[in-house]
Amino acid sequence: VNRARVDIHCDQVYSMGITGRGIGVAVLDTGIFLHEDLKDRVKGFADFVRRKDRPYDDNGHGTHVAAMIGGSGASMEGKYRGVAPGCSIISVKVLDHRGNGYASDVLSGLRWIRSHKEFL
């Protein structure tokens, strides 16, 4: 992520005060673990695989993707941050513990996002 942040000139954007604050990002993946780097910024969660109410990630990929987008870097003293560390995140679990899923679950997830725009 750090190399990508350099390649896309994140620091120049940050110096203008743009951090992603006020922007909501939906991540349709394997779920999300409420990691220190994502603390207080996960604003919504829906599970179309096991229908659980509380956020979880039984694979790790969804958490990794969310951190690449909006991780604060808090667990590593700011060293590894996402590209938009101020954004809000909505996690929609549409993939199972192996990373497999159904197109119908992805479509259900997209519909859920559309009907919960207030989180974004």
Ranges and model annotations:
Residues 12-44, 52-104, 120:
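Subtilisin-like serine protease catalytic core
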